[in-house]
Structure formats: C-alpha cells, structure tokens
Amino acid sequence: LVKAMVSLEPGGPQFGSVDTAKVTAGPRNPNSWGLTNARYEYDAPANSPSDVNVVLEQKSDRPGEAVCWLQVEPARKLTRWKNIRVFSASDSGTYHPVYDPCIPKFLNQAGVKTDFVRFEDVGIAGNSHVMMLEKNSDDIIKYITGWLQKNVN
C-alpha cells in the first residue's frame, strides 16, 4: 500500500518534451498516457493516449519556466492515485526548474493531492542535480521528513 510519494526533480515533462535551452515546450508524445507510455486508469476511461485531450498552458508560472501540457477541462482523474499524497520538489542549480512544475500541475489536475516546493523559496538554496550530496542535504531531508510527518498517517 502506497501512502505517499516523494519526487525530487521529477522526470518530465508529461505528455511531451521541453527544449531547456530555449525554454519552450516540444511536441506532444503520441504514446504518452501522462507521466509514462504505460496505460493509466482514468475516470472517465481512456482507450488510447489520444483520448486524453491536452493543451499547452497559455503562460508559465515564472520567467524561465516552460509552459506545461495540461488536460482539457474537465480533466480525467487518476483513479488509483486518489489516496496517495505526493511531494515534489525542484532546485535552482540544475536544468530541471524549466519544467519541474509541470508534473505536479498535471497530478493536481488529475485529482492527486500534490505539493510542489521550490527549495530556494523555503530558504534551501544553491543545490545541484544531486541534492543528497550537497552540504545542506540535512536541511533538505529535514524539510521532506517534516512534510511526510504532517501529511502521511
């Protein structure tokens, strides 16, 4: 039984790709069900990836972030994920912040309670792609542990 998931620098973006140098979204992957090419159970049911209608956001949350592929409303819900809490985090020292907000946006839209944190916004800055090797890795794990204690019974 999975109660929660912690995702640091989530792979992505969902449904497509991003040119991180140009900070632009790439074309939709016609085989993607959302996060992967593996089939998901949605409510309303989808028989193929093309049944999951998506559109690019009009505007990103911040400068330097790409727009995300999101479902056309009303969004299909991920039925098997509805009782799982997700913590997703990004850091400023890598190329990931360009698209890291996209997966949490998709999950929340699909009915999965997902908290997204940019570590620099909570005073934990200067990390690279390998957070567990940074001098402030203890601060990172304390933050994540605090989230788990607060959000997982």
What are these language model-derived features?
Residues 17-109:
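The feature captures the conserved acid-bearing segment of alpha/beta-hydrolase catalytic domains
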Residues 108-126:
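Catalytic histidine neighborhood in serine/cysteine hydrolases
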Residues 6-15:
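Active-site nucleophile loop of the alpha/beta-hydrolase fold
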Residues 122-126, 130-153:
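Catalytic active-site module of serine/aspartate enzymes centered on a nucleophile-bearing elbow/loop
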Residues 91-95, 121, 128:
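Acidic beta-to-alpha connecting loop that harbors the catalytic carboxylate
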Residues 6, 87-90, 115-117:
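Hydrophobic/aromatic beta-strand patches that form the interior of the parallel beta-sheet core
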Residues 8, 106, 147-151:
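Structured segments of extracytoplasmic/periplasmic soluble domains
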